[in-house]
Regions:
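Short amphipathic, charge-patterned alpha-helical segments
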Residues: 18-26
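Cytosolic Rossmann-like ligand/nucleotide-binding regulatory domains
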Residues: 32-38
């Protein structure tokens, strides 16, 4: 397990998780989320290739439509 910060809150997740795993862990739709790791915004095609590490600061911005 590793400790990191997701949206400012400490989280403990499995070692080897990629960004897509983190998004799914928090039950978010990856098609409506923008992910930022340590201040770097990722493109959606990098979610599966980018591993999260101990101490990372992850921001998940979930877009919700409405009217």
């Amino acid at each position: 397990m590793i400790k990191l910060f997701v949206n400012g809150h400490e989280a403990e997740l499995k070692k080897g998780f990629n960004v897509l795993n983190v998004i799914e862990h928090f039950k978010l739709n990856h098609e409506r989320v923008v992910a930022e790791i340590n201040g770097v915004v990722l493109t959606r095609d990098k979610y599966s290739d980018t591993l999260v590490n101990e101490g990372d600061k992850v921001e998940l911005i979930n877009f919700v439509g409405g009217g």
